[in-house]
Design a protein with these regions (language model features):
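Small beta-barrel nucleic-acid-binding modules, primarily SNase/OB-fold domains
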Residues: 2-201
Length: 201
């Protein structure tokens, strides 16, 4: 058992090295502004996926520690919101239980969740042999809004504009029909019911 753990740790260290070496190139290839994902890469660590809670919140494990990670840089639809289940399913396909990814932690939020960035290995996403920041991938696929690290000011990046124009993901019904998670949480049950009628996946 001890030998198996040693082999696993060596493999995780190799993955960290490969991801850190390629993260800058991977982000530039997507045309993403250099953000937390790149700045924190040197301090990143290998982590195993335990489960996906929703499109931007996951249970992760690093060593013996298990923690809840809130993905920085994006805001994805709530589970009871239009396109929420589809966004979560899209992420769950990328973050299968037991998969090892690179996580750059950046403190805690008001709810005690760990804030951070996630880099996907090349075996998970085809990106010319380079790792891909999960936050950027969600925006490109239309499953999240791009936002700054403190989640207060929307950053209408080129990827989000392209996703809107192409009608990908939550933009299927047009930008005017998309409701941000923050607005959704403020709605009462009657308003939510009205928004659930009409355009669906």
């Amino acid at each position: 058992m001890k030998g198996r753990q040693t082999i696993l740790r060596v493999g995780e260290m190799a993955l960290v090295g490969a991801l850190v070496a390629g993260c800058l190139s991977g982000q530039r290839e997507l045309g993403v502004p250099l953000s937390l994902t790149v700045r924190a890469a040197a301090a990143a660590e290998a982590a195993r996926v335990v489960r996906v809670i929703d499109a931007d919140t996951y249970i992760m494990q690093s060593g013996a520690a298990t923690y809840r990670l809130r993905l920085l840089g994006v805001d994805a639809p709530e589970q009871d919101q239009a396109f929420g289940p589809q966004a979560t399913d899209s992420v769950a396909r990328l973050l299968a239980p037991g998969r090892v990814v690179l996580v750059a932690r950046a403190g805690l939020d008001l709810y005690g969740r760990t804030l951070g960035a996630v880099l996907l290995p090349t075996a998970t996403v085809a990106a010319a042999g380079r790792p891909v920041p999960l936050d950027s991938l969600l925006v490109v696929r239309g499953w999240a809004w791009a936002c700054d690290p403190n989640r207060k000011v929307a950053a209408w990046a080129a990827q989000q504009t392209d996703a809107q124009r192409a009608g990908r993901g939550l933009w299927k019904c047009g930008a005017s029909r998309a409701v941000t998670p923050k607005s959704w949480r403020s709605f009462d049950s009657e308003i939510k019911r009205r928004y659930r009628v009409g355009c669906t996946w």
